[in-house]
Amino acid sequence: MNGEASEIIDAEGMTVTPGFVDIHTHLDAQIGWDPQMTPICWHGVTTALIGNCGLTFAPCKPDDVEILAGMMETVEDIPKQAILSGLPWNWEHYGQYLDMLEELKPSLNVAGLVGHCAVRYYVMGDRSFDEQATEAEKQQMAEIVQKAIEDGAVGFSTNRYEPHKAPDGRSIPGTFAECSELVEIAKVVGPRDGLMQLVGADAEVMKSVAETEGSRVLFSYGCSGEEGSGTKAAMHLDEMNTEGRNITGTSHTRGSGYMFGLQAGLPIQGPTWDILREKDFDGRLKAINDETFCEALVAEAREPKSCQIPLQKVYFLGLEDTPDHNSSQNLIELSKSASEHWSETFLRLTKDSQGRGLFNWRMFSTNLKEQGDLFSSENLIPGLGDVGAHVSQIMDGGWASFILSH
């Protein structure tokens, strides 16, 4: 962070607490091999919430380990093999899972949501993907969630976003669950002061859960980025909290969605680009410094539909060690100012940065001004860093430092 503070406190030798609470981390796996919980521990976060988006590793029967690890891989892009080898998998129930986490001695406070995927699969097995639960099964799920909260979970998470798939292509358990199933679970979560995180829920489901006695709903929120959208979205969120409902949104603090470059993904199609993708980093760097190879890359990029990403929403993060998330010129504008094709600009900036340069497709929070207006709502809190997931794509672990600078 650059700039002078209005007040400086000498904290040498002191513990600075409390800090930021990061409520959307997906650090469930990483904590196994990185109990320091980097990089959020470097950005003032002192408490991390795991178990987001309906995905957790408990409860888990011994034969179901690969199922839960596989779903975490396909939804959150955390390698299954790293999950299987990085954790001891010596638990079945959620309380035992929390005991294991405590033994890891994480550097931050850790709070966990128990996930719908694990609970539903534990109760229903393979039927959990496609079938509705019986009344007895709904009650059994509620009892498991109640026990998890009594053993230390701070709430429950579910995911109704259909594109989130299991390894076999089916939407993850809970995606199509009846609203009554969630209400039954909310009946045991609310009275115990727990959170109900709803991902991808429609207005009717959210309303039904929020109106269950004691319910506190948490969900992901944002605005379109169009002029006035931030204020409008803030007002809508506040209106959702009328009539005694307790609904909190969480949103990105800056443009986020998909990062690409020589060190990560290369979303450009063509035979030469395929060759580049197959190389390791050193091989990629050597290849783009070959003039003939680069000419072939540019020629393929000039073809219609060579890149499906909206390039007018792609921004270069700069050549400095600290990424520039405030850049106002997108890749198309940069290429026009240099009288180049956008692929030539991409390759030139990549070479200038020795392959370290990254390009950010702002899928979410595309307009910082509107995002600031959105945060005028007292029912919205910053987050959605996804620090433990999509590491080569999003991983916005520095959001807390960023928001301090605004």
What do these predicted ranges mean?
Residues 26-29, 53-56, 223-225:
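Acidic, glycine-rich active-site loops and adjacent beta-strand->loop/helix elements
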